[in-house]
């Protein structure tokens, strides 16, 4: 990341991320199509779960941004021990976040969140079923996002494209099988959509871990890097918290939109959910470019190559 011509480097780093995010956005659209075939109530329930899903992602994704910046900067400075600590501490923080989400679900947070947006018992049941599973098994999402960030931080975005793409494809394949009970699987309805998501995320996380262990010599995995250090945590969240807040604001806005639309009809909420996912399809290339640029800037900032930053 410190020698390749900047324009070529940004394209090399960003293009795989843009492609993988487009595949992710396509999955979101296909997922909505399958859920909609169950019933309007099912689609509305899943739509009402979306703001809290986004909030969960904001915590893990924002932590990932902090890891990305600290790790790439440390590599630029040739501080390899510091880079290892950023990776290890970041993974631990993401697992802690997943445990908090799981505990919150066991305490009834999923049901309370859905019921705060609708009084329809069928919609509430569908939404609670979906959100409870996503929260309890959020370790899949947390692991995938964080482990993929380690590949991004070290300039290996091609591997990230493979893991994200595979996760989304598995998700698309498993959705109809688990939702409608095909090929001997039980018909699980919206629960099937949630389980398909978790399966895709978990397989992507395992593949990303394999790539890190076998193809990423910049990070040296050992037990010592997983011991939390306050200084490392502070540095991760110094960059990560603004990112968390930015995504969380979008989550709050979506929640408020849902409250307004449920006053009209459940159909309005379902349509808004589909529109939101369609809209994200067009913004994903920008997010991919952003994810490709961050490690380039951080690495060259650490290496004190200001001409490449400019």
Where are the language model's segments positioned?
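Short alpha-helical transmembrane segments in multi-pass integral membrane proteins
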Residues: 1-14, 71-139, 186-241, 297-310
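Signature of the first transmembrane helix
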Residues: 8-68, 72, 241-263
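Small-residue-rich hydrophobic transmembrane alpha-helices
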Residues: 43-106, 141-160, 271-310
């Amino acid at each position: 990341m410190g020698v390749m011509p900047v324009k070529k480097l940004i394209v090399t780093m960003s293009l795989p991320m843009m492609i993988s995010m487009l595949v992710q956005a396509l999955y979101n659209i296909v997922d909505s199509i399958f859920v909609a075939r169950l019933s309007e109530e099912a689609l509305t329930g899943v739509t009402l779960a979306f703001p809290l899903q986004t909030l969960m992602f904001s915590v893990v994704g924002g932590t990932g941004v902090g890891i990305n910046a600290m790790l790439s900067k440390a590599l630029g400075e040739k501080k390899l021990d510091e880079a290892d600590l950023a990776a290890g501490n970041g993974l631990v923080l993401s697992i802690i976040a997943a445990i908090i989400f799981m505990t919150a679900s066991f305490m009834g947070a999923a049901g309370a969140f859905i019921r705060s947006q609708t009084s329809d018992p069928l919609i509430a049941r569908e939404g609670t079923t979906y959100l409870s599973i996503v929260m309890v098994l959020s370790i899949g999402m947390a692991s995938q996002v964080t482990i993929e960030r380690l590949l991004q931080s070290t300039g290996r975005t091609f591997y990230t494209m493979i893991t994200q793409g595979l996760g989304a494809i598995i998700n698309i394949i498993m959705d109809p099988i688990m939702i409608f009970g095909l090929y001997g699987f039980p018909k699980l309805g919206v629960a099937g959509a949630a389980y398909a998501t978790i399966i895709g995320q978990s397989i992507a996380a395992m593949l990303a871990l394999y790539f890190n262990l076998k193809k990423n010599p910049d990070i040296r995995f050992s037990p010592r890097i997983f011991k939390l250090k306050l200084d490392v945590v502070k540095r991760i969240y110094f960059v990560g918290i603004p990112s968390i807040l930015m995504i969380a604001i979008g989550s709050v806005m979506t929640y408020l939109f849902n409250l307004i639309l449920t006053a009209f009809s459940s159909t309005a909420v379902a349509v808004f959910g589909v529109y939101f996912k369609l809209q994200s399809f067009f913004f994903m290339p920008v997010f991919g470019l952003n994810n490709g640029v961050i490690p380039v800037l951080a690495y060259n900032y650490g290496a004190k190559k200001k001409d490449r930053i400019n």
